[in-house]
Each structure stands twice: as structure tokens, then as C-alpha cells.
Design a protein with these regions (language model features):
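Short secondary-structure junctions and interdomain/linker hinges
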Residues: 28, 42, 87, 115-123, ...
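Extended, charged amphipathic alpha-helical segments
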Residues: 217-350
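Extended, regular secondary-structure scaffolds
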Residues: 123-126, 130-131, 136-237
């Protein structure tokens, strides 16, 4: 009897089964700890009462200390996700040449990705993966007759991603060879104003679902559901640390530096009046012309406060540079971008080379994830269209992650034309469609051809008229 069969033995108490399934096979940081760095409102400076003490006035009023918190970790997660997936992942299909059935299958796979909104799903998965360190995407079918995939299908294929960011605890279970034998997850759901905890497990042939009753009692929601795919209908990915690991001390130093300086500015921003000599009488407030009288050549003036701002600016700028340098991500703030001016495509590539290397470093785990996900989709497609079952596995799918860069279309087109011997790389109809201005490109092309023909005829007539004179 294998390990997972032993764990899921129906004669065992459900609480023991779930306890064994919660024995996580991988070491992933607790999201509750990473959240303290990811969420700016949970940073140390927000609750620090030791080094950031509030001032209590003599009248009992509390003057709160400045607490400036920065969401640099959240920004870093968004930025690396955007660099990885702002340009949608491209799929290249091999071994489909001169085989119409395989070409139809590739179109069906692309349609599955399209109607599952995979591009926006990748953005969500990227944010969750780089911040909370693990994701699990489950694929499932809903009964909905359609022709979205190029054939009459009774079902529509959809996907849903779970991660600790959504309050879901993931429990993958691997065997000694590193193959996943079970995937479990625990989540809470409100039912009639009561929060109920559910625990689900997927194996290669069964789907189990339990709900919690009381503190340690569990009951089955339904009988185990058979999985006809003969494999877990989902994919799991994890990383050993969040993308911002080791950078929190830099962000913390920036927060404390700015907060301390904010207190200094607040203290010294009120006008300070300097009086030299003895003041005679009182100055009446509210008068249009204010008069101060002083004895023995006295003087009165406002004292201007001078702050050594350059040292502070240098310190904060250096820390910001260190933060993004160690993260291997560029600081794409508006201030930095406007100083670059109108640089060429090659210069942009050079500037972003470190970020592209970082995406290349991270892409290995993603490519593996996408390949396993594609295999799950293929298995579903075999069931949805049995006439394709013998050909689906013959198609090879290559996933290409393109790091973000602003393209120079003129340079790209000129380079492609040069490689094409100086000839056009788009037909007239294709260029009209790409421009996007015409609501009916075919009609526009027909009109352009008519106008060209009329102009050519006018030139011919002009030549003959000049000759007859």
C-alpha cells in the first residue's frame, strides 16, 4: 500500500487524515511573517513606541510622532510581475506542420487559454508567487454547451488560483522522488453569517472535501469524487523566500530617517521671533499697522531655520539605489524616467539588462509551471474531444516569457525589412488592420485601390493631353 493510500484509509479518523495531509513537504515562509514587510501599514515604524515616542503636552494633548511608512516591498512585487507578464506569455507549437488535426488542436488550446483569461491570471499568480511564495492553480470544467474551442463541447474549462494572500493554506505532499501525490488546501467561507473552515484534497484519482465542526472535529461534505484525468488537475509552484527577502532593513532605515526628519521640520516650521533689547509696552494684535518699541537700539526679527538638506537627500537616495540594485529591478519612477530623454531601443535594452537577467533567472520555475499546466489542459482536451486523443500528445508546446521593454516599432520594422531583403513584411490589408482606424479594413483597402486606380488613370490622361497639344 503506497503512502497516500495509507493516509486516506477510510477506517482512520478524519482528524488524523487531515493532520497527516498537513505535513508539508516543502519549506515555505509563513505568509503572516512576510505580510509584515509586504503591507506598509504593518511595518515596525507604525507601532514602534520605543524609538518613536509621542509627545504629551502640559495640557494633556498628545502630539503624535511622525511615522512615514513606504510600500517598497509591494512595489517590488508589482514591478517584477509586470516585467515578467506585462507582455503576455507566448506559446510556440511544434510538430504541427502539414497536419490539419494538430493545427486545430493548437487553436483549441489557445482558445482555452484565451477564455480562461490566462494573461490576467498570470498577473495575479505573479503577485502571489513573488510575495507569498506559493500558488496552486486548479483547472475544472463547468457544464456549459459551447463552440469556443472549435468544436461542439458540452463543457467549458476554467481555472482558479489559491495562495496564502487569499487566506488559503496550501499543503502539497510529495513522494521520495519529488512527485506530487496529493495537494490539499484549507480555507474559510461564510455561510449564513457563520465562518466555516473547509479542507480539500486532490489526488490522482480522487477529490475529497471536509468541513470543520467544533474545534477538532471534521466531517465529509460529500463522498470522494472520482477524477477521470488520472492525475491531479492542477499545478503548484513555490519559492524558498519572497522576492523582497533581505531588503527590509534598507526600507526600514529610509522610513526612520524620513520620520525623524519630519519631526524636526514640524518642530522648526513655526515662525520664531527674535527680540534684542527691552520691549516697551505691548504690541496690539489686529491693527493694520503693527508697531514695536524697543529701548537702547534694540531690534526685532524673524529667525529663519536652515537645514542641511543635502546630507539627508544623499542618504535617502543612496538607500533607494541600494534597495533596487540588490533587487535587480530598475527604479522606474517618473523623476528617473523624465531625465533619460528620448533614448533609442538599444539604449533601453542596455539600461534594463539587469532586470532582464533577473527575469531570466526567475523564468525557469515559471516555464516548468506552465509546461505542467499545459499537460493538464491537454488531458482535459482529450476528454472533451475524444477524436483528438491520439494526436494531442504529439504536439510540443514551448512557453516563452518576454521581459518587458518599450518597443521601438520603427526600428523593429526596419530591421525586419532589412532581413527580408528590403521588401514589405505586411500586406496592405494587414497594415490597415494593425493601424486600427478602419471599422471595415477590407472596404478601406478596396477604396484605396479604387483611388490609386483613378489617380493613375488621371496621370495617363494628363500625359496624353500634353502630347496632343
Amino acid at each position: 500500500m503506497d503512502e497516500i493510500t495509507t493516509i486516506l484509509d477510510s477506517t482512520r479518523p478524519v482528524s488524523d487524515i487531515i493532520s497527516d495531509l498537513k505535513e508539508k513537504s516543502v519549506d515555505v515562509p509563513e505568509w503572516s511573517k512576510s505580510l509584515k514587510d509586504y503591507d506598509p501599514s504593518r511595518h515596525k515604524i507604525v507601532t514602534d513606541k520605543f524609538s518613536r515616542k509621542d509627545k504629551i503636552r502640559s495640557d494633556g494633548r498628545v502630539e503624535p510622532a511622525s511615522r512615514i511608512h513606504l510600500g517598497l516591498e509591494k512595489l517590488l512585487v508589482k514591478r517584477i510581475t509586470e516585467f515578467a507578464f506585462a507582455i503576455p506569455v507566448r506559446r510556440v507549437y511544434h510538430n504541427t506542420e502539414e497536419n490539419k488535426k494538430r493545427q486545430q488542436i493548437t487553436k483549441a488550446i489557445e482558445a482555452i487559454y484565451k477564455y480562461a483569461r490566462i494573461d490576467s491570471e498570470n498577473i495575479r499568480r505573479g503577485n502571489a508567487y513573488f510575495a507569498s511564495c506559493e500558488i496552486f492553480t486548479i483547472w475544472y470544467v463547468v457544464e456549459r454547451p459551447n463552440t469556443l474551442y472549435g468544436f461542439n463541447s458540452k463543457y467549458k474549462l476554467k481555472c482558479k488560483t489559491y495562495s496564502p494572500m487569499d487566506g488559503v493554506r496550501l499543503y502539497p505532499l510529495f513522494d521520495e522522488w519529488g512527485d506530487m501525490i496529493a495537494m490539499s488546501f484549507e480555507y474559510k467561507k461564510k455561510i449564513k453569517d457563520k465562518e466555516v473552515t473547509f479542507f480539500e484534497t486532490y489526488t490522482a484519482d480522487r477529490h475529497y472535501k471536509w468541513k470543520q465542526q467544533g474545534e477538532a472535529s471534521w466531517i465529509a461534505v460529500t463522498d470522494p469524487e472520482r477524477i477521470i484525468l488520472k492525475k491531479i488537475p492542477g499545478v503548484y509552484a513555490y519559492r524558498p523566500a519572497p522576492i523582497f527577502h533581505g531588503l527590509e532593513h534598507i526600507r526600514e532605515e529610509i522610513e526612520y530617517t524620513l520620520s525623524r526628519n519630519s519631526d524636526v521640520i514640524a518642530y522648526n516650521s513655526a515662525p520664531l521671533l527674535k527680540v534684542t533689547g527691552e520691549l516697551v509696552g505691548d504690541e496690539d494684535k489686529g491693527e493694520a499697522r503693527r508697531l514695536f518699541r524697543l529701548k537702547n537700539g534694540g531690534d526685532i526679527a524673524y529667525v529663519s531655520w536652515t537645514q542641511a538638506i543635502e546630507a539627508l537627500k544623499y542618504h535617502v537616495d543612496t538607500l533607494l539605489k541600494l534597495f533596487f540594485m540588490q533587487a535587480q529591478m530598475p527604479d522606474l519612477s517618473f523623476e528617473n524616467m523624465k531625465s533619460l530623454g528620448n533614448i533609442g531601443f538599444d539604449a533601453r535594452q542596455m539600461i534594463l539588462s539587469d532586470a532582464h537577467l533577473k527575469i531570466g533567472d526567475e523564468s525557469g520555475a515559471w516555464i516548468e509551471f506552465f509546461e505542467r499546466e499545459c499537460n493538464v489542459i491537454k488531458e482535459f482536451l482529450k476528454m472533451m474531444n475524444t477524436s483528438w486523443a491520439d494526436e494531442i500528445d504529439n504536439i510540443e508546446v514551448e512557453h516563452v516569457i518576454t521581459p518587458f521593454i518599450q518597443n521601438d516599432e520603427d526600428a523593429l520594422i526596419n530591421r525586419c525589412m532589412k532581413g527580408n531583403g528590403g521588401k514589405a513584411i505586411f500586406s496592405q490589408l494587414e497594415s490597415i488592420k494593425m493601424a486600427g482606424y478602419s471599422s471595415d479594413p477590407e472596404k478601406s483597402l478596396d477604396q484605396i485601390q479604387k483611388e490609386d486606380k483613378a489617380a493613375q488613370q488621371a496621370r495617363i490622361n494628363s500625359v496624353f493631353n500634353e502630347g496632343s497639344e
